[in-house]
């Protein structure tokens, strides 16, 4: 009886590991598809315009410089 119980517990644990790893791998696969897909690569091209565009005005910069003196 103990052997059957141990086999049952091991089987349940292994099935849980398989189910969890399948969900994890499918999430990784979907992330890779969205990053490296045609639309994903096309959307990454637009990031350069937003990064280098300053959002602070000259007055804001002067005020910060006065605060840091």
From Swiss-Prot:
Residues 40-69 form a propeptide. The record marks 29 as: Important for activity. It comes from the Eukaryota. It is found in: Secreted; Target cell membrane. Residues 1-23 form the signal peptide. One of its GO terms (biological process) is killing of cells of another organism. Keywords: Amidation, Antibiotic, Antimicrobial, Cleavage on pair of basic residues, Cytolysis, Hemolysis, Membrane, Secreted, Signal, Target cell membrane, Target membrane. This is Amphipathic peptide CT2. It comes from Vaejovis mexicanus smithi (Mexican scorpion).
């Amino acid at each position: 009886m103990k052997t059957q119980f141990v086999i049952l517990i091991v089987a349940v644990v292994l099935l849980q590991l398989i189910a969890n790893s399948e969900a994890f791998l499918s999430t990784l696969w979907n992330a890779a598809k969205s990053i490296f897909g045609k639309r994903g690569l096309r959307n990454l091209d637009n990031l350069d315009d937003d990064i280098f565009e300053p959002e602070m005005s000259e007055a804001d910069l002067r005020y910060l410089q006065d605060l840091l003196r």
